[in-house]
Amino acid sequence: MLKRTAHAAIAVALASGALVATATTAGATGDIRTVRTDKGVVRGAADGSVLTFEGIPYAAPPVGDRRWAPTAPAARWRGVRDATRPGHACPQTGVVPPVGPRSDTEDCLTVNVTAPGAGSSRPRPVMVYLHGGDHTDGEGAMNGAARLAADGDVVVVTVNYRLGALGYLAHPALEKKGAESGNYGFLDQQAALRWVRHNAAAFGGDPANVTLFGQSAGATSACAHLVAPTSAGLFDRVVLQSGACTRDDATTSRAEALRQGVRTARDIEATHHIDDWRTASPAQLVHPFGTGPHYGPVYGGKLLPRTPRQAFATGRFHKVPVLQGMTRDENLARVYGMELAKRQATGDPHATLDKDDYRAGLDAAFGAGKAGAVAAEYPIAAHHDSPALALGAALSDGDHGRATVTNGLALARHTRTYTYEFADDPTPWYADPTYTEPSFPAGATHTFELPYLFDLAAYQPLDARQRALSAAMIDIWTDFARTGRAPWKPTTESALNARSLASGPGGIRPVDLAKEHHYPFWKSLG
């Protein structure tokens, strides 16, 4: 592995132009910033100890007749294409903070490549990242990969794919000649993975060692690739971050997706007739549809015939090594949103959740019939007398906690699986001052592991202890990409053998994830 002590020397060499591509960099042209891909030559930038190539098309723009159509190949280009700026984000509402910008441009199917600037005697592992954002927001370029690539000695590829209605809308009117609607964003991801297989070597990567990893919606997408027959051979390992895909709300059946699409179309058809959908501007479609169906991979058709739960139970999935896990306090982010909503509704900037809010939150999440049992399992008094913390624990455990345990045990029956829990506390808060901190400790909530792996402007800088944990996590993630193994015992059919990842002495340690997240209770609750 490229050690951190070498970075200064690499940076000097890059600045002086002393480094040249090695013979293993198949697409090199003599200038390390210029690479020949299968569609043409791109020129990137030397940035410290890494090379970056941004906005490289991996598919044709999904415009005109290509809107709501399977991904088409990118066209070839002549000359040298500038790859020093990110491509456009795919059309999105920009309402899922802080993960995505608002965008109305469909010419967005691009990848970004970050590679160590130093030569290597052998190809490097490739890590392909699928961003989160509820399948409606986000972009690849927001995840700066310089630390991950340089410290881990890997090639990192981040991907843009179609989102929201343009990526996942299912509707009978969109189905022609036996084609299934929905899953256009998923098809984009497959095309990006094929691009990686064809072009990784040009950037010094090993096309025979590709790790697919994602967070939240990106992880549920990666999970879908695990079970999609046509994703066979496109990756060699998988990392699932906060995306346990055996959750009840992680999958949508084809029948339900079609019902949702018809229902949403009916609501907006007065101003956007279905005959005009292919010629309407992205903004006309993204924003009316943006608050409609739950978007994401659609199961039950030819592309995804089985849900992850069905596939894991029967072993009918791609049996590659898996690293999977969650943040300890996943749904405190959701509770934070509830507190913000109360402050806005009451006009009181200091409003906090009370006992009534706690019970209403349990009723909404679990139904009135089960809320009493959940309240007894998660009494407010056991959570520092904080209704918010008690509600956050119940929501986190009943959702991600239960599913992460179920996911790990199911996967381990068929393939080598490792389980982790990100548990650092405190964690960096959002950098945007408009996101005021909650009245309760945010802890290790949803997305808060990301600044430990990526260079993210959306969060405040890591302190010294957090940087040490970041270095350890980058080692774990990239060593897994290199070898398919983590530095602890794998999960078995009967034991998760999970690792807690936190800063400070003893922060990385074994954790009984099932006990910590009340798994026996949730399993008995049904």
Regions found by a protein language model. Name each.
Residues 302-304, 381-382, 398, 412-417, ...:
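Alpha/beta-hydrolase-fold serine-hydrolase catalytic core, especially in secreted/extracellular enzymes
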Residues 28-122, 277, 283, 485, ...:
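Catalytic-loop region of hydrolases
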Residues 279, 283-465:
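Substrate-gating cap/lid region and adjacent catalytic-acid/histidine neighborhood
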Residues 1-28:
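Secretory targeting and sorting signals
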Residues 35, 55, 90-275, 279, ...:
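Serine-hydrolase-like catalytic core of hydrolytic proteins
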Residues 48, 188-191, 195, 221, ...:
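Extracytoplasmic/secreted proteins, especially bacterial periplasmic and envelope-associated proteins
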Residues 162, 213-217, 421-428, 489-496:
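Short, solvent-exposed turn/loop segments enriched in Gly/Ser/Thr/Pro and often Arg
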